[in-house]
Amino acid sequence: MDSFEWLQGYTIGFGLHHVDFTNPNRPRTPKYSAHFFSQVVKNNGFPKPDDDKMLYGHFRKDFIWSTATASYQIEGGWRADGKGLSIWDKFAHTPLRVLNDDDGDVACDSYNKVEEDVAMLRQLKVTHYRFSISWSRVLPDGTTRHINEAGLNFYHRLVDALLAANIQPHITLFHWDLPQALQDIKGWENETIIDRFRDYADLIFSRLGHKVKFWITINEPYNVANIGHGYGAAAPGISFRPGTLPYIVGHNLLKAHAEAWHLYNDKYRAKQKGIISITINSDWSEPRNPYKQVDIDAAKRVVQFYIGWFAHPVFNGDYSNMMKTIIRERSLAAGLPKSRLPEFSPEEIKRIKGTYDYFGFNHYTTVLAFPVDYGNLQHYDADR
């Protein structure tokens, strides 16, 4: 148990049990290490848990093997053939935004290397290839006022080359590189972007849909909403309203996704026979101490505010009760007249719910959760 640690006195504790030295009764509370140690004794060692055991076998014969890219990450050709500026063009050209002031002006030069890229995919023997369309390459100002046919031709050549190699294209409509012209009128904060995104999706479905069976509306909306508009660590680099703007942007992303899904479902699905969904990203979260309820609760909040932020409206309808309650209560406690989380109308809830054909999910890591007291700070991190 914790004890008098010589020169450190009672400032540190190495024991299996915590001792409250401020209490005259000196109560003992088992730490996680005590539970772990008792399990080691019980097992007389360290048997490998089932979830750590190697699995052997074969995937189904129709299992999809794929690789994935994003337009700004690989294409280059940032001003080629009439392409408009994107928010990542501006962001990466701003000093000190990207390490070494690197940018995607040329990147992998995939705009000029379609045949070479497809040859590499053939060597990998993949069955599918996921890539994204650069919105500003086909619609330089983000609207259908001017359609850049040269940009569309690039994607026609890529899709045709993939199909000739017996590789199915899987197209993402939006992978973060919003046309700068739309950002100039507040981008995803401005509700008009919902119609602009629908118009853009309509163009792509009409031009490429007869060749493409797999679609993603928006890739990783969490990153767009919070990394780009809360932390400001990615384009468009906005960080001065972290308690409100991410939720406004997320709200419009969900409505834009729903409109694109319904457009495909109502106008194109019967003829083109494809499938379409949103792709959500999220870390998983485990309690730092699985025997402490506050850590268990913190882990649940992380998941609800990460994957649940976007999955709950799409799959279940509306934001989760946990998310709505926490943000509302913290907003009111800070003296605000209402919740910082926008509300969906009953019609919008119905419109968004069920807008999926599959569960698109990107997962990279797992984090340990524990409560942190942010006081009345109005911020996404404090909310969760």
Regions found by a protein language model. Give the residues of each.
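Alpha-helical scaffolding within the catalytic cores
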Residues: 51, 113-117
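Short, well-structured secondary-structure segments
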Residues: 127-134, 168-172
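Active-site region of glycoside hydrolase catalytic domains
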Residues: 1-98, 122-123, 141-143, 149-384
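Active-site mouth loops of central-metabolism enzymes
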Residues: 99-113
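A common structural microfeature
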Residues: 62-64, 111, 128
